[in-house]
A protein has these predicted regions:
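Short, Lys/Arg-rich, polar N-terminal cytosolic tail immediately upstream
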Residues: 1-11
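Extracellular loop-to-transmembrane helix junctions
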Residues: 9, 32-137, 246-249, 256, ...
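Central hydrophobic cores of alpha-helical transmembrane segments in multi-pass inner-membrane proteins
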Residues: 28-30, 52-65, 144-153, 222-223
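Inter-helical loop and helix-membrane interface segments of multi-pass membrane transporters/permeases
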Residues: 40, 109-144, 186-208, 276, ...
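Internal alpha-helical transmembrane segments of multi-pass membrane proteins, especially GPCRs
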Residues: 46, 94-97, 161-167, 240-248, ...
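TM-loop-TM module centered on a large, flexible mid-protein loop between adjacent transmembrane helices
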Residues: 75-86, 118-123, 248-303
């Protein structure tokens, strides 16, 4: 990667390592997860993000222990469980990770098309209708996946050089969105108005939402820091800090988004319950409802 092999020959710093982790974590999940979690669990979804982050942090710290011990190992990420367990277990896990990576690509493409479809109302129903992609929508998603492939094949050096800048942008947009939502409209009563409790559907939903609403998925990607463990400056110090730091930074952003989303909804919209919410491009549509059209444009561009 170009940000590893800099012209000055310097090894990437802790900031660059955190940027790698944050850049890999922040994807399409934040565009939908706060809405899906609110709809499924109600305001108690805030706790779901903390649980998801703790699970990711546990895995991150275990990964850090191995990565620092084998920091000079070539291809550590691919051989991680072969080193810690055995070749058979490592093969099974590596295959599972490969399938997960394959699934991530169309998931990101679907998220992009679902958001962008709402920016063009005249063709929206032709691409995405009744919470499902049409045949045309699936074809557009496939074309976008091909574009992603060419972008990564030919543009990887350019993107790698700009990794830190891209990461700052990826953090700025959700953070700015959360702050603007809080400033534009915040209804504290939303946190307990339905059934008079923060957990109208039960506290068990707080745990279920971690898996079913894309919360843990939104933290997926921090492990990519270990791919560059051999090139990092002072890996024994920087790998644990980068892994933990990237997860915690993203947790703060996600909590801001979740709290701002819950607070920004008009109380009249949830009289019948959080499960009655119906958005296809949640944050962008909410921005339009609040009259913050420029944020909606930024969200569409970011998508």
């Amino acid at each position: 990667m170009a940000f590893i092999e800099s012209s000055s020959g310097k090894q990437p710093s802790l900031f660059s390592a955190i940027a790698i982790g944050v850049g890999c974590i922040v994807g399409s999940g934040w565009l939908f997860a706060s809405y899906k979690a609110s709809k499924f669990a109600g305001p108690v979804a805030i706790g779901s993000w903390v649980i998801g982050a703790l699970l990711a942090l546990m895995i991150a710290l275990l990964l850090a222990e191995i990565a620092t011990f084998y920091s000079k190992e070539t291809g550590l990420f691919a051989r991680l469980l072969t080193i810690t367990h055995n070749g058979d277990f490592g093969f099974i896990n590596a295959s599972s990770n490969w399938f997960a990576t394959i699934i991530t690509i169309p998931a990101e493409a679907e998220a992009s098309i679902q958001y962008l479809a709402q920016a063009f109302p005249k063709i929206s129903n032709s691409v995405f209708n009744n919470d499902h992609f049409t045949h045309l929508g699936i074809a557009v998603v496939c074309l976008l996946m091909v574009f992603y492939g060419f972008l990564n094949y030919w543009g990887i050096k350019l993107l790698a050089k700009a990794n830190n800048t891209i990461t700052v942008f990826k953090l700025t947009v959700p953070a700015l969105t959360a702050i603007i939502f809080m400033a534009a409209s915040f209804h504290p009563e939303n946190f307990s108005s339905y059934h008079g409790t923060i957990a109208p559907y039960g506290y068990d939903k707080m745990f279920t939402a971690v898996v079913t609403c894309g919360i843990f998925y939104s933290f997926y990607g921090f492990s990519m820091i270990t791919v560059f463990s051999k090139e990092l400056k002072n890996p024994q110090r920087n790998i644990p800090l980068a892994l933990a730091g990237s997860v915690l930074i993203c947790l703060v952003i996600y909590l801001m988004l979740q709290i701002s989303f819950i607070g920004a909804i008009e109380p009249s919209e949830i009289i019948g319950g959080w499960h009655t919410l119906d958005f296809t491009s949640p944050l962008a549509q909410l921005a339009i409802i609040l009259g913050i059209n420029w944020i909606a444009v930024v969200l569409y561009v970011d998508a």
